[in-house]
A protein has these predicted regions:
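PRPP-associated nucleotide enzymes
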Residues: 1-248
């Protein structure tokens, strides 16, 4: 929800997640708390597509993948449903001095999501946050140009929208995508990911209609990569190659 928080009153701030029941999350109990359960992102996407396809009224869904790692996953889900894949371009806002971690996210329409609890712990100044946000917005714009070539997102009004990524760590990147999709009036929003921490899956599930996650893990230390036997970070060239293969 939009809240007033000093200098950041126009941003969407989410408090720390509190673990609750796992309602609204469809998982594979055989994969619960296990590691290295998928060969790679394509394998994970194929398995996920089989499960997503069992949901009611998913025919004709809009499938949106979050680059980079979500593209091969979303590609397989779209193939299972006979849908066309589109992109939900969202980037985490990197913590100064620690580019592997983030304290929020920026989506394609300029929406900004701040992890307020982490921001307070880090003790970041307003100037630090503004600099990081502007850098992230620039990166999002560059990716829009590189990956979409000006193609508009499909109409989502009255349709089921499936948001796909290769996993949920904090969940804030996905939450930013959800916030940008919701005003487009989809009939429902489904988040489909191969793996997630239990807390992030619960956080996201409270804000969408359904979370489909094959591999939910409850350990305090969580890494998306630990679900995959073959893991590496996709670069922009590989994303373009995936999209070219699909003639997007």
């Amino acid at each position: 929800m939009p809240v007033s928080h000093g200098h950041f009153r126009n941003y969407y701030v989410v408090p720390d997640a509190e673990f609750r029941s796992m309602s609204g999350i469809l998982e594979n109990p055989l994969l619960h708390n296990r590691k290295y359960v998928f060969s790679d992102r394509h394998d994970a996407g194929k398995q996920l597509g089989v499960l997503v396809k069992t949901l009611p009224s998913v025919h004709g869904s809009v499938v949106l993948a979050i680059p980079a790692g979500g593209v091969p996953v979303g590609r397989e889900i779209a193939a299972a449903l006979g849908s066309r894949l589109s992109l939900a371009i969202v980037r985490k806002i990197q913590i100064p001095g620690n580019p592997e971690a983030g304290f929020g996210a920026v989506s394609w329409d300029g929406q900004v999501l701040i992890n307020e609890g982490l921001r307070a712990v880090l003790g970041l100044s307003d100037a630090d946050i503004e600099t990081a946000i502007e850098r992230t917005k620039k990166n999002v714009h560059e990716r829009i140009v590189r990956f979409t070539h000006g193609r508009a997102l499909p109409k989502m009004s009255g349709k089921s929208v499936i948001l796909a990524d290769d996993g949920l760590a904090s969940g804030f990147t996905m939450m930013a995508a959800v916030k940008s999709v919701r005003p487009l009036s989809p009939s429902r929003i489904i988040v489909a990911v191969p793996t997630a921490s239990a807390t992030s899956a619960e956080l996201v599930s409270r804000n969408v209609d359904q979370v489909v996650c094959l591999n939910v893990r409850t350990s305090r230390q969580f890494a998306v990569a630990d679900a995959y036997r073959q893991w590496y970070d996709l670069d922009d060239r590989e994303v373009v190659h995936e999209l070219t293969d699909m003639e997007l």
